[in-house]
Amino acid sequence: MNNFDTLLQSIARTTVVCVGDLMLDEFVYGEVSRISPEAPAPVIAVQRSEINVGGAGNVARNIAALGARCIFVGLIGDDEAGRTLNAELASEARIEPLLVCDPARPTTRKVRFVSEHFSTHMLRADWETAAAASAEIEQRLLDAILSQLERADIVLLSDYAKGVLTVRVIATVIEAARKLGKRVIVDPKSANFAIYRGATLLTPNRKEFVTATRCAADSMDEIATAAQEAIAFADCEAMLVTQSEHGMTLVPRAGEPIHVPAMPAKVRDVSGAGDTVAAVLAVALAAGADWGTAMRAASAAAAVAVSKNGTAVVTPAELRRKILPHASLAAEDKIIGSDAELDLRLAEWRRDGLRVGFTNGCFDILHPGHVKVLTAARGACDRLIVGLNSDASVRRLKGESRPVQNERARAEVLAALEAVDLVAIFEEDTPLKLITRIEPSVLVKGGDYTREQVVGHEIVAARGGEVLLIDVLPGFSTTSLVEKAREGTS
């Protein structure tokens, strides 16, 4: 636990320069219940759709989600998809997008039609130009990349063969990075590994490895033998072959191969799992992890990623839960730091069909009355979010002498309780804005309120939710406890 937490803290201090093919992933969810009368083709009744930053952009988002800083260089067209991608990346606090616009090509866009019920892909439509970038665009890409290398702890090239990573771009970046003493990880697409000559690590999947080496890759010995030949050919330090449910095998230039089995996972969607592996390897190695530690973290992250729909990111809290399934979630991971983090947790819970509950208060001095309400609230839902008044909010409501404990202390006490799954601090006098964002299925307050007095009851009722009032425990009040303490009584 301590070593893993130290690794996460180190990751948060790293910077990755990520270069690669950016694409817009769109997922259209629906069901097929009939055949078109116009042609023998299924008709999809669309229920919802969503967009995600895909390709190398998904690598960048995973790097940022793990707490590292990512300087991302990619290519877009002068179109709506490109503008959407630019806006999405720019909205990420830890991503610094340096996107080159090429009006002569469309932004790569992939639309997947997915069964909402079975989570299976029915059709994919692609808009793309895979031709290599022109000499002018190539130079603009290099200018952007080379100007940022000194800031990097590690460089990651994510090749989807859509024109960004030309032979010249790859060779120039690897040479420049090596001169600066920066390691370079490549997630390759080309079957000619020689174009990545001089990289630190290549991370092909099994299919890419078999195509490039003409090796059957049916055993670890076969993989090791073929990888050593490829390492010599590409002049790299190591090769890591990902093998889906069979785990991943790393073959170093010197030393014994390392195999890490795949972690168990309920597979919903494998889109972007390779991006997650590359991102975790990069940040872990940049943070000082050895090969084995980086691989175990990457394997755990891949298991989390494939359990989600669409191209998804993995958070430190999710990674911790996967690596340490029997350990309690650390209290600090229950305290939400941003709206984006809250949205990620909510999306994860809703994908799993979990019932989300909400209650709120100042919780200045935690007492048995609070514990009763929190325990009852947790019993009425699968995940409980506690809205906590900020210090400024408490002062406005209770007076200048309150709170007794600051908001961080109050949040840590609440987060240490087993009944509490998340703590969200709000600045307003009421949690209405927070409730509107969360849209809980259950809204809980003490029985000293009426249903109509509970802030947000209309929002919950409108969505078919429940407002639950818990009988208060007589004799317990924070105000009376504070007064007794000041009077010196017990």
UniProtKB/Swiss-Prot annotation:
Keywords: ATP-binding, Carbohydrate metabolism, Kinase, Multifunctional enzyme, Nucleotide-binding, Nucleotidyltransferase, Transferase
Region (Cytidylyltransferase): 358-490
Any one GO BP annotation for this protein: ADP-L-glycero-beta-D-manno-heptose biosynthetic process
EC numbers for this chain: 2.7.1.167, 2.7.7.70
CDD domains given in the database record: RfaE_like
InterPro entries: Bifunc_HldE, Carboh/pur_kinase_PfkB_CS, Cyt_trans-like, PfkB_dom, RfaE_dom_I, RfaE_dom_II, Ribokinase-like, Rossmann-like_a/b/a_fold
Gene3D superfamilies reported in the protein's UniProt record: 3.40.1190.20, HUPs
Annotated NCBIfam families: cyt_tran_rel (TIGR00125), rfaE_dom_I (TIGR02198), rfaE_dom_II (TIGR02199)
Biological function: Catalyzes the ADP transfer from ATP to D-glycero-beta-D-manno-heptose 1-phosphate, yielding ADP-D-glycero-beta-D-manno-heptose.
Assembly and interaction partners: Homodimer.
Protein name as catalogued: Bifunctional protein HldE
